[in-house]
Amino acid sequence: KTIKEAIVFDGEGAPNEIITIAPTHFSFDITIEGRAAHAGVDPENGISSIHIAADLIPRLPQGRLDHETTFNIGTIKGGNVRNSVPQNTIINGEFRSPSIETLDGLKMQVIEAINQVKAKYQEANVDNQIYANFKSYKIEKDNPLAIRIASAIKSLGLSPKTKCSGGGSDANIFREKGINSVVVGMADHNMHTLSEYVIISELVTAAKLCELLIKKIKD
């Protein structure tokens, strides 16, 4: 049978929270190739890819740019040993927003920053890839699945809440495939940090919500 609906337990927060807006997510990979040289004997002949990366990164945005847009440098990998001018550095980053215009502007900012660095360090090679990982979506108030979820939440004695999220989930991909998908909270907090935790009582409620929704489908 063709799957028509999906309830995704992947939201940060309590299970009474329903995600109604999620962003489009872009990744970018910047590869910088300088020239290796002995750091103590012949540094003049080297081109430090790490130094170029350090010049490039401040030209890019960082953090929360507005209420629905974020930009982040996630990893920097460069050099092999301390006594060699580093030849290769890779910068991996991302930006997210539900706004197409904002995303287009950020893509241009990344490209412009790279072009500035290319012009400044002409003996180095600076390449980049910018690509979309998943697309944004918006759940309308009359979405039948969201309405059923809200009703089930009320049946558990809770008040349903809707919110925007900067995170992505299976729902982004499912919705691209034509599957009406809604994300609810899974009792997780401080996601993607060393202080991430789950509130057990919320997790139990999430399980009860899942059970109730399955029973409603069977009925």
Stretches with model-predicted labels:
Residues 31-37, 156-157, 188-191:
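Glycine/charged-rich beta-loop-alpha catalytic/anionic-binding loops adjacent to active sites
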Residues 1-135:
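Midchain, well-structured core segments that form catalytic/ion-binding scaffolds
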Residues 48, 141-144, 198-202:
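Alpha-helix N-cap and loop-to-helix initiation/capping positions
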